[in-house]
């Protein structure tokens, strides 16, 4: 399952929508909830990012992300 993680680069400042960035993770999970938990844990262990939201991408949404050219999987 591919998850899109929305985050701020630092926890030091208040989140601002215009500074929100995203990364994509391929997570092996039995359920959507388990995948969200694993994704948050991975990001928190490997970065200082402030995670805002984690979204499971549907096939159509994933295709759209690939078409726009912003899709690249992040590996830790």
Swiss-Prot record:
InterPro entries: RpoY (IPR009907)
Gene3D superfamilies to which the protein is assigned, alphabetical: RNAP, epsilon subunit-like
Keywords: DNA-directed RNA polymerase, Nucleotidyltransferase, Transcription, Transferase
Primary enzyme class: transferase
GO cellular component annotations of the record: DNA-directed RNA polymerase complex
Recorded GO MF terms: DNA binding; DNA-directed RNA polymerase activity
Catalytic activity of the protein: RNA(n) + a ribonucleoside 5'-triphosphate = RNA(n+1) + diphosphate
EC number: 2.7.7.6
Superkingdom, taxonomy of origin: Bacteria
GO biological process: DNA-templated transcription
Pfam family, one: RpoY
UniProt-listed NCBIfam families: PRK13667.1
Family: Belongs to the RNA polymerase subunit epsilon family.
Functional summary from the UniProt entry: A non-essential component of RNA polymerase (RNAP).
Subunit structure as annotated in this protein's UniProt entry: RNAP is composed of a core of 2 alpha, a beta and a beta' subunit. The core is associated with a delta subunit, and at least one of epsilon or omega. When a sigma factor is associated with the core the holoenzyme is formed, which can initiate transcription.
Protein's name according to its UniProt entry: DNA-directed RNA polymerase subunit epsilon
